């Protein structure tokens, strides 16, 4: 992190960081104060004016790595900023010498030179991919007060609207007081299978249910006006509607500072990771259910594709499948992509992560700091994306889990998304930002379409640009930041001083080394209600009338180190 504040949401208690660099001018003087930030989990606006501020993490840099070897794609590197060699930058290395880089729909592609086909640049090590995922929703930190006042749950037992009736027992009373107004892509609430316990944030189902029973996620996101309405009237004046998952970034979303307003999250993200804990309590014999296998099923949708992982709870065999989007009949069997054994064997407690990221499916089972837990599907888990890349109605319920012939309890539901690299660029000439090309030519109404995937897709296709950068030279590299909406990186560097042939390139002689370890995350103040005692205050900028803003502590003591954040940089 750079200069930031640590925030614990007042409503859902999710902890997150918010950037605070906008409080300072280019000379380091305090010019404005960050006032509110928006929780990435529940969107509650949190008052942060009086929270302490922290400098960026201190890292170890291996300066010898690139003296004896070449940089590797996705390394985190430290280098001299090409436009001002007195400044050091830290970014992730994306493009290698000789490559032409293209960015589109949140993904990065490369080809050698000016010829050949572009290939997606996925993280070859899935562990690195896993570490880079960003929070969409953590059900362990649900906004319980908001839900109690009528806002709908995001995870809901659901069934296909015209599914045949099952031999379930009495309906389970709903814990969600606001039923969906109409089916979502043919899905309706199912009160006859999973039982939701809002106190433990878990779902339970008894063995013996014949059909596959689903719990699905809907991206029901409260707005800041929702929070204000609830505070004023204790109820919502309208029905909440699911929307597409976007590239919302809590680190950038605040009021105050030099930016004046909050970042606009307007780009659909279809690359998701579903995490959960599954406790299998009982298995119904196949002969009793009429099904060949007792199964645990995970599903992620992205546009016209549905990606499924079916795990045989008796044998542990996992099978990856996808639908055939070109089939005229929806009843056509799914396409088997790959199979692999897993540690799942009968009853027991298992942690699972299922990811669809960068045109590849990944599954982790019982991952710990000592063991990866990655299931080896091989190249069969990789795929070519469909021709139609636009979102569909199914993306309003983009993740789900189900069981068949099992008694189970599912908890610790966390949905994440991949980094969305925005396709922004600047013309490759000498100059500053006069020729800036945004990803969307007209973004004025794109957010209005987030609840209508087909309309969103039509507007995006009509107004979207891809960003393409000239082929890198033999000793040049392309870098980007993980915080794509705000990152000052190869996409947008000025070229007024150096007049480089490739304004987007980092020359080899500017590389300082590979960042490999966070050895000093910022300390945590204690005493004085957790704020410590001021040691040094900020220096506020001044005009003829005096300071522009009231100062506050820049350093406080005593403090203790965040030893749990001492870690290798991946």
Language model features by range: what are they?
Residues 1-570:
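Extended hydrophobic leader/signal-anchor segments used for secretion and membrane insertion
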